[in-house]
Amino acid sequence: MPPAEVFLSHASEDSPMPQNLATTLTRHGVPVFFSPINITGAQQWQNEILGALQRCDWFVVILSPNAINSMWVKREVAYALQDRRYEDRIVPLKYIDCPLESLQWLTLFQIINFAADFKSGCRELLRVWGIGLREELLP
């Protein structure tokens, strides 16, 4: 079943991959909260992020060295792990190889590998929701 809305947790330094993923999901009919798009000028971004975490029904985190060192990614992951709505609805994506041993919570989840191939990663992620990849919708 497709999600109502996906929270996309990422490190801003990892652009353009998070942007490309948000675009791909949106083009496949999956609503995404992606802070660079959904938070506009004059908004209090901390409140917007908290509101999105409370509203979304799936949590996708893009793992990279930047992400595992990001205070905000750590906070977002901690929130998702404690919120029962996200039980069985947290999807970690490995974008860039990084030391995952420090992330004890990861042992609970199957990681989707985006490090080798963006298209294959998108195919596997969309399959989680029963959606087939349409290559013409890739950025």
Residue ranges and their predicted role:
Residues 65-84:
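Conserved TIR/SEFIR loop-to-helix hotspot centered on a Trp-containing motif
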Residues 59-60:
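Hydrophobic acceptor-binding patch used for acceptor engagement in glycosyltransferases
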Residues 1-28, 91-139:
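C-terminal interaction surface of TIR/SEFIR-family domains
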Residues 44-49:
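Short acidic active-site motifs
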Residues 56:
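An anion/phosphate-binding loop that grips the pyrophosphate of nucleotide cofactors and donors
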